[in-house]
């Protein structure tokens, strides 16, 4: 029964992300600890969000701004390597603390959000978004401010954001596989 409920929640949060363009992953990772063990939280979240974002990127492929992907990808590879090494030293019992702190700061701290906006490079955005996703799971807001600044068209922002999040989640899933 938990699997059915989690599937419905995943569908609903993915729908929110599809309509609004962001937020579904953060909602999902806040709910998931009620249904799955902590050691599976980040990898399962990565798999669900990988499929959600990848399908959104495929459906909106004509709006994806491919010129940002190489810089983001390079930063992502470096970030995932460094943060994967750090992950070996973090106890799983702290993962909910990191996730909760990140969500609260993202939603309620103007100062935190201002600091995030300083990373005005797709390389740095890839580094931090993909690296931090190993620990907190839902890091989509890190690139959305940059995309919103560079592209005023909502379809371009949503499709490109989905492509970048697909990269993040694919790399995260590969790291957790090994």
Regions picked out by a protein language model, each given a short descriptive name:
Residues 85-88, 92-96, 134-141, 172-176:
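Hydrophobic alpha-helical transmembrane segments in multi-pass integral membrane proteins
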Residues 39-110:
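Membrane helix-loop-helix hairpins that form the core translocation module of multi-pass transporters
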Residues 4, 28, 94-100, 120-123, ...:
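General structural feature for long, well-ordered alpha-helical segments within catalytic domains
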Residues 102-159:
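Membrane-embedded helical hairpins/re-entrant loop segments and their flanking transmembrane helices
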Residues 3, 7-71, 140-178:
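Small-residue-rich hydrophobic segments that form or flank transmembrane alpha-helices
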Residues 30, 34-39, 73-82, 106, ...:
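Small-residue-rich segments of transmembrane alpha-helices in multi-pass membrane proteins
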Residues 1-16, 117-131:
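Small-residue-enriched transmembrane helix starts and helix-helix packing motifs
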